[in-house]
Curated annotation (Swiss-Prot):
One of its GO terms (cellular component) is cytosol. It is found in: Cytoplasm. This is Ribosome-binding factor A. One of its GO terms (biological process) is maturation of SSU-rRNA. The lineage of its organism: Bacteria, Pseudomonadati, Pseudomonadota, Alphaproteobacteria, Rickettsiales. Monomer. Binds 30S ribosomal subunits, but not 50S ribosomal subunits or 70S ribosomes. One of several proteins that assist in the late maturation steps of the functional core of the 30S ribosomal subunit. Associates with free 30S ribosomal subunits (but not with 30S subunits that are part of 70S ribosomes or polysomes). Required for efficient processing of 16S rRNA. May interact with the 5'-terminal helix region of 16S rRNA. Belongs to the RbfA family. GO terms for molecular function: ribosomal small subunit binding. Keywords: Cytoplasm, Ribosome biogenesis. InterPro entries: KH_dom-like_a/b, RbfA, RbfA_dom_sf, Ribosome-bd_factorA_CS. Gene3D superfamilies: 3.30.300.20.
Length: 128
């Protein structure tokens, strides 16, 4: 019988954890990165590795930055090969996963929902 929920395997979770540690280390040191990322504090919110371990989707959120979303994406994509090489040196696998960066809209969506709830005329129907 097929599972209805998709769960990550132990290998996917382990690889995502290693990639997260490596990305944090690289972002702290600032080595091998595009110069635009030096003064751009980023948070890696989550990493999702595909079932075949070939692709790692890395979600990030910038804090207090002067750079636009497109500039950050361009800088991360310019540094992608150096980051992948650094990850390759840390893992013991036949293939190193391709790194893809995505902006995490979770924080923006939470702020929008909070504003909608504050500004709405939502009333508890049980109190009427």
């Amino acid at each position: 019988m097929k599972k209805l929920t998709k769960t990550n395997s132990h290998r996917q979770q382990k690889l995502a954890s290693i990639i997260n540690e490596v990305l944090i280390e690289i972002l702290k040191r600032g080595k091998m990165l595009d110069k635009r990322l030096f003064d751009c504090p980023l948070t890696i919110t989550k990493i999702i590795v595909t079932a075949d371990l070939k692709i790692a989707n890395c979600y990030f959120f910038p804090f207090n930055t002067k750079l636009t979303f497109d500039e950050i994406m361009d800088a991360l994509n310019n540094s992608k090969h150096a980051i992948r090489n650094f990850i390759t040196n840390r893992i013991n696998m036949k293939f190193s996963p391709e790194i893809r960066f995505y902006y995490d809209y979770g924080f923006d969506n939470a702020i929008k929902i909070e504003e909608l709830l504050k500004n709405s005329s939502f009333k508890d129907k049980t109190s009427e």
